[in-house]
Amino acid sequence: MEQRKVLECSGKNGLSISDLILVAILLAAGAVLKFFVGSMFSMGMKPNFIIAMYCLSILIIRPKFKDAAIIGLIAGAICQFFPGTPYINFISEFVGAIVMAALVRIPYGTGKRFSLIPIVSTFISTLASGFTFIGIMYMVFYSGADIKPVPLAIFMGIILGTAFINAVIVQILYVPLKLALKK
């Protein structure tokens, strides 16, 4: 008589279809915001709302680090469709997504109805992405590439302003979206 073994896999292996759809919709919304709303703030640079949307998606779906890294790389690829410094966003959005994935894993122990985790995590992740971007850009500039540097004070204003805007957007959207998705 033949004995059969049944193996069960516990834990999820990658993102579900609904998680992928959520990430796609939020990244698309971030691209639209970057294109239209970012134009209003244009001083040669545009705030990057794509960061807010990948932070929101990582906050809601809480992916593994490898999945968060892929979300960051996809966000970097989407940023390539917009004018600016090419290719740097691949690295900066990767770093921002990994930082966000790390921050959502910290056990904060808040049992309160209102949490500041979304606003704080998004602010820090946006800073990580922005500082990575400016660091790489200045390294490339000072290594002899033909890139015109924007004064550091302007970049700092853009990074801090974008971090603030992204943090507020994510804080406002987090609870309603989480409730709507029943997560």
Q: Across the structure, where does each feature detected by a protein language model lie?
A:
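Hydrophobic transmembrane alpha-helices
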Residues: E2-L59, A97-R105, Y174, K178
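Membrane-helix interface "capping/anchor" motifs
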Residues: I58-I71
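Membrane-embedded alpha-helical hairpins and interfacial helices in multi-pass inner-membrane proteins
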Residues: Y87, I91, G111-K183
